[in-house]
């Protein structure tokens, strides 16, 4: 049989996902279109879509499309279609109309016109006609109006495909089965299931998400439970082809059930659990998923479940008329996820992005969907501490705090007090106030002040010898106390986890909020971002290095290599540099540097921003340009698709410094810095130069407890150092 063009309808905003699914099913030319997706193939392909599509509402086989001069042409247009090729006089049919037709205000008018045309054609051919059965017809005819165009199709589905056959009608506030499947697909459940991950719904309701998750994980065709489809009453139905598809689906089901992993659904309502178990049995999955009455606060992973997906459709304002404070419900859900499901992924389906913020988690992806007429968002999360950014735990009552928590609070308060006079004298607005002073509370805490006060907390990853539960408890104590001691709202406290970084991991984007805040340093203005990256855009330990650069820059040609957000360039320019050149591989950070320059009124051709691999750029500039002052602050280790090879600062620093010194004017200075704690400078390899260690002089007071936070040297050509020692240059007094 020749190929046909089929149309698969889908819930709003799911056309692209449906097209992807149809492509995976082997459908030719699957493409999103208005209201769903189109594909081509044989009748057997239409059957396959009915059997296997988890997302489609209906599979339609178009018969004709006509342009109408007016509503009175509907009857004659329908009369021309050979309905006898699809229906016999002793069978029944029903007609459904969607869309809008010019001149037709009541869809029932179009339905009656087509019904009469079918009756007239059959009466003319056979002297009798098929009857109309709106509830259980042998054949469903679908009409779609679009202005003056009317399309006629056969509905191969019969009942909507979301009706799998396992759920009772009338369940309270149902999530339709195909929407539930779409949520699971968007959340990455097929990949998680393939890797042996678990699925858990802490508010499972009638169990739809868990059952659809089981069908996906076990490779069970969603239409396998249905006894009847729309094509069964069609005169051209190919029963052998249908039986072949069923046989294949049954074999795949048998194989898939053998690899089905952990599936758990919890709900506080015992009736919901009973309904879920009933639906599970009707789906032929009795005993293969676990449903249990549990409060949200009692929700835990299964004992054997190390990772997986938590997916949930919490109540929202329009749903069920829930009386509970939904903000508190979302906050409790977020706390459960952060405390018990670290390493998992999560997906929350909500009608309110504002409620989603109460979770205290930064979404990695957001999809727009509809639950019936209600516009919703599917928020996808990775449950990792680096995504915990707000809504911190409330401080534990004094009677519940451990002695260690009290010591932590006291130390934080004392540190802040001890630094107060120094801050006021030097005008320091951004500083480190705690750096793992108590080993049990392995945190670095930085205070930023601008139009508001913010706290940036970095947790040092605990070694394997530390009990993860104890570490989480201490973190929770600390996060509860920080807002109290520092008098900062919880939403202005941001948490990151500091692990040993590989490649450019410390510069990789964590989120895309685009929220920047202005802070100041020695009268200069900088933009910081607490959410999107591991670091904020302002390295506080280099504060005195930047001030030194500013003091040495008057009239100088300044070069900033591995420039990050260009803060050193701002100091140089405001210190009177004749020109500045800022080089970094990242377009993102160069744009950030440009904003910092603009914020301080620095603009013009004398201030260049160059996106380039710094090592290649240094080599390319040899013999072409010279600079009087160079700041070289490379990462400890780096690799990038756009970078030539890798950079290991311990291994490569001599070569890099030698190459950079070729760009340094006689009499100039190279300031070389890095943050590798175990770094050892190779003085023998740098013997041709004068090397002065200024690490101690450039260590800010707030970092005194951690003297190895950075290493810093001034490197000069020998004649430059000799001249300065003889007093020919008085700039050394600034160092």
From Swiss-Prot:
Residues 45-156 form the THUMP domain. SUPFAM superfamilies: S-adenosyl-L-methionine-dependent methyltransferases. One of its GO terms (cellular component) is cytoplasm. Belongs to the methyltransferase superfamily. RlmKL family. The keyword S-adenosyl-L-methionine applies. Keywords: Cytoplasm, Methyltransferase, RNA-binding, rRNA processing, S-adenosyl-L-methionine, Transferase. CDD domains: AdoMet_MTases, THUMP_AdoMetMT. One of its GO terms (molecular function) is rRNA (guanine-N7-)-methyltransferase activity. Pfam families: Methyltrans_SAM, RlmL_1st, THUMP, UPF0020. This is Ribosomal RNA large subunit methyltransferase K/L. InterPro entries: 23SrRNA_methyltr_KL, DNA_methylase_N6_adenine_CS, RlmKL-like_Mtase, RlmKL-like_Mtase_CS, RlmL_1st, SAM-dep_methyl-trfase, SAM-dependent_MTases_sf, THUMP_dom. The gene is rlmL. It comes from Allochromatium vinosum (strain ATCC 17899 / DSM 180 / NBRC 103801 / NCIMB 10441 / D) (Chromatium vinosum).
């Amino acid at each position: 049989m020749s190929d046909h063009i089929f149309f698969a309808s889908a819930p709003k905003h799911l056309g692209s996902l449906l097209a992807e699914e149809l492509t995976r099913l082997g459908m030719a030319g699957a493409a999103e279109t208005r209201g769903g997706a189109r594909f081509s193939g044989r009748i057997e392909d239409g059957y396959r879509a009915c059997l296997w599509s988890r997302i489609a509402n209906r599979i339609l086989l178009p018969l004709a499309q006509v342009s109408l001069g007016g509503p009175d042409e509907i009857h004659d247009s329908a009369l021309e279609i050979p309905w006898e090729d699809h229906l016999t006089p002793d069978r029944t049919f029903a007609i459904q109309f969607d869309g809008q037709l010019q001149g037709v205000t009541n869809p029932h008018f179009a339905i009656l016109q087509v019904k009469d045309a079918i009756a007239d054609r059959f009466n003319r051919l056979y002297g009798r006609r098929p009857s109309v059965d709106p509830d259980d017809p042998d054949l469903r005819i679908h009409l779609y109006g679009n202005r003056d165009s009317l399309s006629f199709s056969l509905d191969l589905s019969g009942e909507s495909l979301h009706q799998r056959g396992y759920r009772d009608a009338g369940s309270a506030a149902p999530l339709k089965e195909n929407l539930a499947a779409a949520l699971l697909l968007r959340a990455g459940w097929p990949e998680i299931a393939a890797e042996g991950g678990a699925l858990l719904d802490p508010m499972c309701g009638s169990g739809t998400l868990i059952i659809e998750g089981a069908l996906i994980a076990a490779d069970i065709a969603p239409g396998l439970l249905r006894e009847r489809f729309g094509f069964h009453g069609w005169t051209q139905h190919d029963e052998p082809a249908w039986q072949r598809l069923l046989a294949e689906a049954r074999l795949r089901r048998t194989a898939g059930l053998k690899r089905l992993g952990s599936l758990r659904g919890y709900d506080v309502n015992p009736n919901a659990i009973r309904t879920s178990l009933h639906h599970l049995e009707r789906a032929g999955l009795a005993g293969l998923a676990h449903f249990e009455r549990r409060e949200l606060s009692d929700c835990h992973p299964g004992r054997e479940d190390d990772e997986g997906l938590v997916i949930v459709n919490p109540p929202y304002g329009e749903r069920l008329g829930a009386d509970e404070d939904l903000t508190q419900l979302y906050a409790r859900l977020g706390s459960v996820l952060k405390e018990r499901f670290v390493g998992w992924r999560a997906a929350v389906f909500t009608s309110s992005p504002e409620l989603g913020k109460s979770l205290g988690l930064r979404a990695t992806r957001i999809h727009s969907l509809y639950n019936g007429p209600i516009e919703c968002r599917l928020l996808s999360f990775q449950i990792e501490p680096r995504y915990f950014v707000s809504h911190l735990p409330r401080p534990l009552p004094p009677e519940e705090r451990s002695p260690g928590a009290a010591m932590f609070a006291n130390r934080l308060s004392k540190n802040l007090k001890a630094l107060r006079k120094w801050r006021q004298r030097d005008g320091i607005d951004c500083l480190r106030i705690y750096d793992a002073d108590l080993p049990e509370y392995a945190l670095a805490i930085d205070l930023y002040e601008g139009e508001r006060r913010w706290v940036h907390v970095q947790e040092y990853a605990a070694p394997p010898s530390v009990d993860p539960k104890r570490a989480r408890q201490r973190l929770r104590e600390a996060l509860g106390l920080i807002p109290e001691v520092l008098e900062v709202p919880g939403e202005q406290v941001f948490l990151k986890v500091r692990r040993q970084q590989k490649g450019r991991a410390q510069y990789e984007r964590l989120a895309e909020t685009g929220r920047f805040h202005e802070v100041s340093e020695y009268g200069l203005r900088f933009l910081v971002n607490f959410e999107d990256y591991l670091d904020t855009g302002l390295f506080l330990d280099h504060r005195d290095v930047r001030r030194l650069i500013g003091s040495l820059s008057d009239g100088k040609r300044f070069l900033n290599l591995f420039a990050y957000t260009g803060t050193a360039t701002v100091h140089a320019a405001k210190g009177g540099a004749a020109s500045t050149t800022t080089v970094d591989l990242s377009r993102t950070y160069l744009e950030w540097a440009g904003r910092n320059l603009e914020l301080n009124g620095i603009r013009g051709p004398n201030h260049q921003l160059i996106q380039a691999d710094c090592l290649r750029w240094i080599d390319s500039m040899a013999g072409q340009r010279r600079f009087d002052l160079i700041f070289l602050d490379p990462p400890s280790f780096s690799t990038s698709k756009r970078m030539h090879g890798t950079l290991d600062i311990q291994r490569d620093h001599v070569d890099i410094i030698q190459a950079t010194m070729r760009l340094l004017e006689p009499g100039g200075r190279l300031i070389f810095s890095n943050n590798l704690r175990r770094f050892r400078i190779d003085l023998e390899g740098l013997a041709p130069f004068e090397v002065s260690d200024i690490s101690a002089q450039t260590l800010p007071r707030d970092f005194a407890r951690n003297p190895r936070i950075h290493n810093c040297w001034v490197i000069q050509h020998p004649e430059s150092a000799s001249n300065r020692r003889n007093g020919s240059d008085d700039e050394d007094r600034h160092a």
